[in-house]
């Protein structure tokens, strides 16, 4: 992972955006299917 020399903005971008999208998609999935 660290050998790719990625830009310093790419790591926090993935670290923040990916979990946000994952949580949002999961939330919408639960709301759509009424899984409570």
Swiss-Prot record:
The keyword Chloroplast applies. The keyword Transmembrane applies. It is a single-pass membrane protein. SUPFAM superfamilies: Subunit VIII of photosystem I reaction centre, PsaI (SSF81540). One of its GO terms (biological process) is photosynthesis. The chain crosses the membrane at residues 10-30. It is found in: Plastid, Chloroplast thylakoid membrane. Its main location: plastid. It holds the Pfam family PSI_8. One of its GO terms (cellular component) is chloroplast thylakoid membrane. Keywords: Chloroplast, Membrane, Photosynthesis, Photosystem I, Plastid, Thylakoid, Transmembrane, Transmembrane helix. May help in the organization of the PsaL subunit. Belongs to the PsaI family. This is Photosystem I reaction center subunit VIII.
